[in-house]
Amino acid sequence: MSEDQGSGATRVKLVVVGDGAVGKTCLLICYAQNDFPVDYVPTVFENYTATRKRGNEDIKVHLWDTAGQEEYDRLRPLSYPGADVVLLCFSTISQSSYEAIRDKWAPEVNHYIPDVPSILVGTKIDLREQQHPDPNSGKFEPITADMGISMQKQIKAKKYLEVSAKTRQGLEEVFSAAIEIVLESRGMDKKSQDGSSSASGVPSGDKPTKGKAGKKKSGCIIL
């Protein structure tokens, strides 16, 4: 985390990892652009920027999206240097993505950036609530909140939070928690100038922008 050159805002670099199809990109687009995309646009890596207020202070959050597919395993670590916090994402309707947190994602993050705090995030909770057992394929067993907390303890993540990008349930809470963890780790957890002690979910006025490419992303790859 650092001061954004020329803006005076505090910079937070947030990296999101997890299996393909857990909804990482939709999560970032909904937070940064206040929009739930429906079109599929394949990408490997994308950056977004969102600015939030914390009292009188601007927090500029640089969001780094990564591909979860195995063929990008050698490229993905390029996203890690300079990270302040990591979101480890799994789908609450995918047992395999949940197990991959323990077997792949937490070990990978701990290898490349062992001192960076992480938050475990269970996505697609709107679909978890809609799922019903299929008598032809066996009983459907979604990932419960208790299972998420258990995994959080196993991998020593700072928090476990659940979210739906589509309904926005838990969306601001996830990113506000990430911001606060970073600020606390830098000794900036005291009350800010106007007495507020948490990052607001309301944009500070800057229109959120995407990082590398100049075009606004219109679609969502379910990474």
From Swiss-Prot:
Family annotation (SMART domains): RAB, RAN, RAS, RHO
MF annotations from Gene Ontology: GTP binding; GTPase activity; protein kinase binding; signaling adaptor activity
Family matches, as Pfam families: Ras
Keywords: Cell membrane, GTP-binding, Lipoprotein, Membrane, Methylation, Nucleotide-binding, Prenylation
Lipid-bearing positions (S-geranylgeranyl cysteine): 220
Subunit text: Interacts with rgaA.
Protein name: Rho-related protein racE
Gene: racE
